[in-house]
Amino acid sequence: MYTLGIDVGSASSKAVILKDGKDIVAAEVVQVGTGSSGPQRALDKAFEVSGLKKEDISYTVATGYGRFNFSDADKQISEISCHAKGIYFLVPTARTIIDIGGQDAKAIRLDDKGGIKQFFMNDKCAAGTGRFLEVMARVLETTLDEMAELDEQATDTAPISSTCTVFAESEVISQLSNGVSRNNIIKGVHLSVASRACGLAYRGGLEKDVVMTGGVAKNAGVVRAVAGVLKTDVIVAPNPQTTGALGAALYAYEAAQKK
């Protein structure tokens, strides 16, 4: 039996195809979000990789901001539930999930059975999200991929005191004009993102193991900063952008069994 999970996010769409509720046969990401083409492109890539067709899918669950825009889904489930489901499948010891996506950040507390105990979310401001990093990369004339490497070369941390993206952008420009090292500024940017995410995690009381997911988890500089703020090891989920879609595919498998 094949089931499908689609995660329609603000910056990207993800598709995961699961076989018999346990084997991942495709996990694809396209950098197009809630627009109509994003989910379909992710789905097309998943079908291409797996060699499957639409008719092979027994059940489909959509999640993410744009989940109601994907008309082929049998069911829609919140991204909080799907991230929890996906992470518990991958890392059963997870008790705290830190998810930093394109437009929001979340902290989710799990019990020992993978149930959600608490969750906290920042979706009111771009600061502390992938969007914040994109803005800073543009100002610093670098790429998101290069930022983690430049962070490693930093000799100090140039703190970013502003919690608003617009003011933080001005602060970074001022630091550059004052001759502050770009690498040190990048380290400060990563610390700023990490601090906001860790603030959410601390609100519920931190429990180990801590697992990071979302696109920003691919940035080793942010992961190091999160570990430093929390003073604990941080596990990066395998293929961290697709954990929500994986959770959706797992929910789809459960639903298909009840049909």
From Swiss-Prot:
Keyword Iron-sulfur (UniProt): yes
Keywords: 4Fe-4S, Iron, Iron-sulfur, Metal-binding
GO molecular function, one term: 4 iron, 4 sulfur cluster binding
Cofactor note: Binds 1 [4Fe-4S] cluster per dimer.
Binding, [4Fe-4S] cluster: C125, C164
Keyword Metal-binding: yes
Cofactor(s) this protein requires: [4Fe-4S] cluster
Highest taxon listed in the record's lineage: Bacteria
Subunit structure, as described in the record: Homodimer.
Function (record text): Required for the activation of lactoyl-CoA dehydratase. This protein is extremely sensitive towards oxygen.
Protein's name according to its UniProt entry: Activator of lactoyl-CoA dehydratase
Source organism (scientific name): Anaerotignum propionicum
Name of the encoding gene: lcdC
